[in-house]
């Protein structure tokens, strides 16, 4: 382990084999907490390569829980977090809109590390049981078309890494890894990151992980979602090719809002915001959700443009389909 950390300290990249070996040792309890923290910091300072990120993702997925389900076209819209925006739970709210639009959503998420309320926190406040067994979660998914997978329970091996992450309290390669290690074999994905310089490389990792179609999104002001406060950049993975583009609210015929307009609060406050959006109450929260759900519909390939996706998202919310999915999840995942 010492040699690996010294190599990273010299800003030398690790091979896929080296990274695989290191992570296998970590997730089987053979590395100290201090060494894990040093590794995470060294990787962050050097900059993580697609090869390193793919290796760690494959190891972590290999140690994940298996969710038995009859659904084979699941999608997730989990982001990396760590953007310090303190926004409401955008992707969690958008997940219900996507599910209401007919997409099988297996929302993967965790408690907050660097914000006030993570996806697990807000859903727990809404009465969702975070601790169902994998077989029970599979049944929920089959019945409702939506399920929440609590990352802490899905990845028991993460217990070896979590203390170092919490002690560091800053985004690391594990933030970048979380959305890549979904327990299910996803076909499509919308993945938000707070570092736009990693758009293309993250799309490459998704390709390596077998995604058929995906979008990696980096919003304005470091937001790990699409934003109405400036230019949003995306990388689209389609037919094995990666293309980069960007858009503004004006491009989509939408009104712009400042970051402070979408600030959230604690889990209970964010739960109230989520409910207000699904009830179609006009606000910057609603508009931001519509934007991100629209991007999700496009990432899934359900429609042919982000603008069409935004229109579909509005219809789904207005018809009560998104709220209906929340009520279903509250009924079955309890």
UniProtKB/Swiss-Prot annotation:
Residues holding Mg(2+) 1: 91, 225
Residues given in the record as 5-phospho-alpha-D-ribose 1-diphosphate binding sites: 79, 82-83, 87, 89-92, 107-115, 119
Residues involved in Mg(2+) 2 binding: 224-225
Self-association state and partner proteins as the record states: Homodimer.
PANTHER family: ANTHRANILATE PHOSPHORIBOSYLTRANSFERASE
Purpose of the protein: Catalyzes the transfer of the phosphoribosyl group of 5-phosphorylribose-1-pyrophosphate (PRPP) to anthranilate to yield N-(5'-phosphoribosyl)-anthranilate (PRA).
Listed name of the protein: Anthranilate phosphoribosyltransferase
Species whose genome carries this gene: Streptococcus pneumoniae serotype 19F (strain G54)
Lineage: Bacteria, Bacillati, Bacillota, Bacilli, Lactobacillales
